Regions:
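Short beta-strand segments enriched in small/hydrophobic residues
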Residues: 18-22, 59-72, 178, 186-193
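Short acidic capping loops at alpha-helix termini that bridge into adjacent secondary structure
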Residues: 186-187, 217-219, 266-272
Length: 336
């Protein structure tokens, strides 16, 4: 096997020092004269030299790796976010690495520590608990975007931590109001686990819409943000006499639709459905599910801008939008 060219080989061919080669490869810390830089780059190309990524990370104090830590990559919303972030960072000559905590706090802490050892350039974190245990990032030197840190909770004094703000309450209010516009009067809520901040916020939005319409609250059914959570909610929903339901995410909606179909309950004729945090998958469920969506591409761009330093706003905000399909009773064609 041919010997891999080294930095010494590049320096020898370019007629300069290994330190100067390092400055060219790492983009600093010292400037290099244009003619010298040209010789070094030509030597690198001629020899086929490939810089050691780990060594570059050590010299710069960071790598070209951006990390995403989520509790469940099976969640279509989080999977789509990972895909969009990968595309966004690839355009910026960075690589995305993804950790899945499986909704386990110990696993989450282990992954965070592994990311830190890799000297990542930045982190987007959707945590298992709320508020997030920010003490784990107390001395972090990289920018961090918190994807589900509750508004109003302490952010510490870390100048490079920001929060991506999505108005969960407003999204649930919009979903509920849309069902009311279809003449539904007994609107239930399939929420997330008890105690989760985003579950509480969605319930608040649902209650607000019902209160403003002068209607009594329907059933609130708690369960995990999974297909199994939707499956488990189905019988309670049927027994409650609801004629409509706001479902907290697309995974729950998938499980719920299957169970309603198995029980012979027609959607939307008997129970209309609107899901929160929808993705492109909602169009391919049956019936296609009306959803309140977060623009994932906009989220990914905002995260990348913050991490790369082009936007250092304290909070990054995104606005949800209602996508009308058939599960609520709207007329819908996939060709529209």
């Amino acid at each position: 096997m041919a010997k891999q060219p080294t930095r010494d080989d590049v320096a020898r061919l370019a007629g300069t020092s290994t330190a100067v080669v390092s400055y060219v490869v790492n983009g600093g810390p010292r400037n290099v004269r244009p003619e010298t830089r040209k010789r070094v780059l030509e030597a690198i190309e001629q020899l086929g030299y490939r810089p050691n990524a780990s060594a570059q990370s050590l010299s710069r104090g960071r790598s070209d790796l951006f990390a995403l830590l989520v509790p469940d990559l099976a969640n279509p919303y989080l999977a789509e976010l990972a895909q969009r972030l990968e595309e966004e960072f690839f355009r910026r000559d960075m690589v995305l690495v993804v950790g899945d905590s499986h909704d386990d706090q110990d696993r989450e802490s282990t992954i965070l520590e592994a990311f830190r050892r890799q000297q990542i350039a930045g982190l987007a974190w959707y945590g298992v608990t709320q508020p997030l245990p920010l003490d784990l990032l107390e001395d972090a030197s990289f920018p961090v975007v918190l994807l589900n840190e509750p508004d109003g909770h302490r952010m510490g004094n870390h100048p490079r931590i920001t929060r991506l703000v999505a108005d969960e309450q407003e999204a649930a209010r919009v979903a509920t109001e849309h069902l009311l516009q279809h003449g539904r009067a007994r609107v239930a809520m399939v929420a997330g686990p008890k105690g989760r901040h985003n579950a509480r916020e969605r319930i608040r939005g649902w209650r607000l819409a019902l209160r403003e319409a002068g209607l009594e609250e329907g059933a609130v059914i708690h369960g995990p943000f999974t297909r199994a959570g939707g499956v488990q909610a189905a019988q309670t929903l049927i027994d409650s006499g609801a004629d409509a339901v706001v479902v907290s995410n697309e995974l729950q909606a998938t499980g719920l639709l299957r169970e309603l179909h198995c029980a012979g309950v027609a959607v939307p004729e008997e129970i209309a459905i609107v899901a929160l945090n929808g993705t492109a998958l909602s169009e391919f469920l049956w019936p296609p599910v009306t959803s309140v969506d977060v623009p994932v591409s906009s989220q990914a761009e905002a995260i990348a801008d913050f991490v790369t330093g082009t936007d250092r706003a304290h909070d990054l905000s995104v606005t949800s939008r209602l996508t009308k399909r058939a599960s609520c009773g709207c007329s819908y064609s996939s060709k529209e």
